[in-house]
Design a protein with these regions (language model features):
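Short polar catalytic/cofactor-binding loops
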Residues: 7-13
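Active-site catalytic loop in hydrolytic enzyme cores
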Residues: 86-185, 191, 247-263
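Cys-nucleophile CN-hydrolase/nitrilase-fold catalytic domain and related Cys-dependent amidase chemistry
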Residues: 14, 22-101, 173-198, 202
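Short beta-strand scaffold segments in enzyme catalytic cores
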Residues: 81-83, 94-97, 128, 218-220, ...
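Short beta->alpha transition motifs characteristic of CBS
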Residues: 44, 96, 107-114, 219, ...
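Short, acidic/polar
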Residues: 16-25, 146-153
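Extreme N-terminal starter segment of soluble prokaryotic enzymes
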Residues: 1-4
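CN hydrolase (nitrilase-like) catalytic-core segments centered on the catalytic cysteine
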Residues: 60-80, 146-236
Length: 264
């Protein structure tokens, strides 16, 4: 299976995000990608980065999701679209999953929030496994994938061949220009993603925005911890790479003995 990891610029608005999303989807589908993933809360854009993303209502978000479903169907490609979502008086940080036929398959919530996000979202409580064209996958969103490896181990133990990791690391105002993926002087993010793959013997796909000062690049990491491909630090775009589910054995995840660890 070929997958696509989108690295768009930070959106100016929901409409701008949808415009960019359609362009990247239209680029990924002809390259043979069967699923494309976007960065964390791409709709309307991760808050607190100095941009005014405006006020979004649930009606606006539902309309945006409908447009994403139409894009998926028009291009015959499944889509993982992270976004805000209003539910029962709460605002959730979710990743919506849409089939290549434009059918809504469900969403994964961000369950472990960064401490700085407690006033932005309500944490979710459920974890889910999704399946597209016979490939099972999980989703872990930003902080929880970096800091809580259990979120990835759970998916691997449930049979996921790959875990997608939409995230937001970096900014456009100040920072360090990265040049080499996984370099020892880079922020820890890429190294954490490498570990999530190899400690579970599955694929791990990090998906970040294109920033002037990124702290990580969108990348596909193999079950042995090898970075198979990554997006350029200096260019927006979409990365298309192939996975071989026969290599994603999940062997190390299957050896985990949860009974040895009592968190109560």
């Amino acid at each position: 299976m070929k997958i696509a990891l989108a690295s768009p610029p930070y959106p100016a608005s929901v409409d701008n995000a949808l415009y960019q999303a359609e362009k990247l989807i239209q680029s990924a589908a002809p390259a043979g990608a069967e699923i494309i993933c976007f960065p964390e809360t791409y709709l309307p854009g991760y808050p607190g980065l100095g941009y005014d993303t405006g006020t979004t209502t649930q009606e606006m978000l539902e309309s945006a999701l409908t447009r994403v479903c139409k894009m998926a169907a028009a291009n015959s490609i499944a889509v993982i679209m992270p976004m805000d979502w209003h539910e029962a008086g709460r605002i959730l940080n979710v990743a919506q999953v849409v089939s290549a036929k434009g059918e809504w398959l469900g969403y994964q919530t961000k369950n472990q929030l960064d401490p700085t996000e407690d006033n932005k979202w309500t944490p979710g409580t459920d974890r889910n496994i999704f399946e597209v064209n016979g490939v099972k996958f999980g989703i872990t969103i930003c902080h929880e994938g970096f800091r809580y490896p259990e979120s990835v181990r759970w998916a691997a133990m449930k049979g996921a061949s790959i875990v997608f990791h939409p995230n937001c690391t970096g900014n456009n105002t100040a920072g360090k220009q990265l040049t080499e993926w996984g370099h020892q002087d880079n922020p820890y993010y890429e190294k954490a993603q490498l570990l999530r793959a190899m400690e579970n013997t599955i694929y791990f796909a990090g998906v970040n925005y294109h920033f002037k000062y990124p702290d990580s690049a969108s990348a596909l990491i193999g079950p042995d911890g090898t970075c198979i491909a990554h997006q350029s630090y200096t260019e927006a775009g979409v990365l298309v790479a192939e996975i071989n589910i026969d290599l994603a054995s999940g062997s190390l995840a299957k050896r985990f003995k949860p009974a040895l660890y009592n968190y109560g």
